[in-house]
UniProtKB/Swiss-Prot annotation:
Transfers the 4'-phosphopantetheine moiety from coenzyme A to a Ser of acyl-carrier-protein. The gene is acpS. It comes from the Bacteria. It comes from Caldicellulosiruptor bescii (strain ATCC BAA-1888 / DSM 6725 / KCTC 15123 / Z-1320) (Anaerocellum thermophilum). Its EC number is 2.7.8.7. The lineage of its organism: Bacteria, Bacillati, Bacillota, Bacillota incertae sedis, Caldicellulosiruptorales. This is Holo-[acyl-carrier-protein] synthase.
Length: 121
């Protein structure tokens, strides 16, 4: 059963030259996400897509509870599809709400990235 849906759209240009903004990257992304971003040579579409996915997940959990961006990790599944791993407050919130799964989809063009997250009970 669907608990909630979140969506986010971001401009890719906001994430150009992000390699120079190391502090921002370290504040928003987990070490696993940063490793993937480095493998992709700091591709702004990749960074924008991951950022949009984190925002979409946060919106799908829209309860007013604030948590750190690093509490939401976007991973690549075996088939290459994005998967969500939660930590700390985000993980605890899902447990409290009875959320069993969060699915996420990411897409991007040259100028925008979009992500949709569905929280399921």
């Amino acid at each position: 059963m669907i608990f909630n849906i979140g969506i986010d759209v971001v401009e890719v240009d906001r994430f150009k030259d992000m390699k120079r903004f190391d502090e921002f990257l370290k504040r928003v992304f987990t070490s696993c996400e940063l490793e993937y971003i480095k493998q992709k040579r700091y591709n702004p579409e990749t960074i924008a897509g991951y950022f949009a996915a984190k925002e979409a997940v946060a919106k799908a959990l829209s309860t007013g509870v604030v948590f750190c961006f690093k509490d939401i990790e976007i991973q690549k599944g075996k088939t290459g599809c994005p998967m969500v791993k939660l930590y700390n407050r985000a993980e605890a919130l899902c447990f409290e709400l009875g959320i069993k799964n969060i699915v996420v989809s990411i897409s991007h063009q040259k100028s925008v990235a979009v992500a949709v997250a569905i929280a399921e009970k």
